[in-house]
């Protein structure tokens, strides 16, 4: 079978890349080792935050503004609700992250409300010290991640895309055409888009032609859910990011299973996916979050459940978006990338079709930034 494009990794970004490729009329194959949506990658666990006022830097904001539009368009086209626009509450002190959030609001005229510590307690029952403040970003919130991936794949298939659930064992190149060999089949493709998350090193290792080195690591991440009679989506509680020491908690209002909370910078650095042990394998799977979070959310009750996933990391925590070969495009290190999924999926397909990359993408996300490291 011959295709115009193969998308390797049909998760967050790959599912939307497949959708946009099929929408452009390209003969498309989405390849994933597991039947998506699944629990072996980075996007499961029901929800992912969406925000535009970005503490990680303003270079991301144009991509986020486009993503906001694309999420809405996709919801309308598919007649499905994927985005809860309940707001995103950033909470912290005079940190670089919070100053970046404030700068984003000002420079991009984003809809937001500033709250002091007293107002945070009165309005949301969140207890913080007097030097903390909140920035409530209006019309943002969170996206239903598993449902989004499933919906994008289904939409791609309705447009003629094929899915291949199998493990890739070999990728070679002959006369400008890529041949992808899986355990049970073989296809030929003109172009490849790799968006394989924490599996990217496995994919690149079976490429039998020269490619630049891509520095993507893997971190095992956990999230916890807590029972509560408060902090509910139905009560108007927003998604949140809360500064804690040199780290951040992030979380989601209770809409089914309790208040979901994660912690940004903790988690074991691992080398292979086999090292991602199940939730509860380490004592800190509950302690890293549960030991501290109730200081800020006094109405939380008992821990109810936990989950584990893997995050792909670049050395500087920024995305890697670049051509690895003339017709092989790579997007990786997307540890905070789910909110960008439709934008990055569309960007990757367009880059392959035009053989061009926007100058701002080259400036901030090119693989070349690591050449001197």
Q: For each of these PLM feature ranges, what is it?
A:
Residues 13, 19-23, 81-83, 198-326:
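Active-site substrate-recognition segment that forms the wall
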Residues 47-123, 132, 248-249:
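Dinucleotide-binding Rossmann-like beta1-alpha1 core, especially the glycine-rich loop
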Residues 6-8, 187-200, 345:
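Short hydrophobic core segments
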Residues 23-43:
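Glycine-rich FAD pyrophosphate-binding loop
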Residues 295-373:
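C-terminal catalytic lobe of FAD-dependent flavoproteins
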Residues 73, 93-160, 164, 170-175:
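Flavin (FAD/FMN) cofactor-binding and adjacent substrate-gating region
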Residues 4-30:
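N-terminal Rossmann-like FAD-binding beta1-loop-alpha1 element of flavoenzymes
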Residues 170-187:
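Conserved beta-strand-loop-beta-strand element in the redox core of flavoprotein oxidoreductases
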């Amino acid at each position: 079978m011959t295709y115009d494009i193969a998308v390797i990794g049909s998760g967050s970004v790959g599912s939307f890349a497949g959708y946009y490729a099929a929408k452009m009329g390209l003969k498309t194959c989405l390849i994933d080792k597991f039947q998506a949506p699944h629990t072996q990658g980075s996007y499961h666990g029901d929800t992912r935050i969406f925000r535009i006022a970005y503490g990680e830097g303003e270079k991301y904001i144009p991509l986020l503004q486009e993503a906001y539009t694309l999420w809405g368009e996709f919801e309308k086209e598919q007649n499905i609700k994927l985005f809860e626009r309940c707001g995103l509450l950033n909470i912290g002190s005079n940190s670089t992250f919070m100053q970046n959030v404030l700068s984003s609001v000002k420079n991009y005229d984003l809809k937001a409300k500033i709250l002091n510590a007293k107002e945070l307690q009165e309005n949301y029952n969140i207890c913080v010290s007097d030097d903390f403040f909140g920035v409530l970003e209006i019309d943002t919130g969170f996206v239903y991640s598993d449902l989004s991936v499933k919906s994008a794949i289904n939409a791609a298939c309705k447009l003629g895309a094929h899915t291949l659930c199998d493990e890739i064992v070999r990728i070679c190149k002959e006369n400008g055409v890529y041949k992808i060999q899986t355990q049970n089949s073989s296809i030929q493709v003109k172009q490849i888009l790799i968006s394989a998350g924490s599996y990217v090193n496995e994919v690149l290792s079976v490429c039998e032609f020269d490619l630049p080195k891509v520095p993507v690591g893997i971190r095992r991440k956990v999230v916890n859910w807590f029972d509560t009679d408060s902090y509910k989506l139905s009560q108007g509680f927003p998604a949140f990011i809360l500064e804690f020491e040199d780290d951040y908690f992030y979380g989601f209002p209770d809409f089914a299973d309790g208040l979901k909370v994660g912690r940004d910078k903790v988690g074991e650095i691992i080398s292979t996916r086999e090292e991602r042990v199940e939730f509860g394998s380490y004592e800190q799977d509950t302690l890293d979050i549960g030991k501290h979070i109730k200081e800020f959310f006094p109405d939380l009750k008992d821990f109810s459940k936990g989950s584990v996933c893997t995050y792909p990391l670049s050395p500087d925590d920024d995305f890697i978006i670049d051509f690895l070969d003339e017709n092989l495009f790579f997007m990786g290190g997307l540890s905070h990338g789910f909110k960008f999924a439709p934008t990055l999926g569309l960007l990757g397909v367009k880059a392959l079709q035009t053989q061009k990359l926007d100058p701002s993408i080259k400036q901030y996300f090119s693989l070349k930034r690591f050449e001197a490291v």
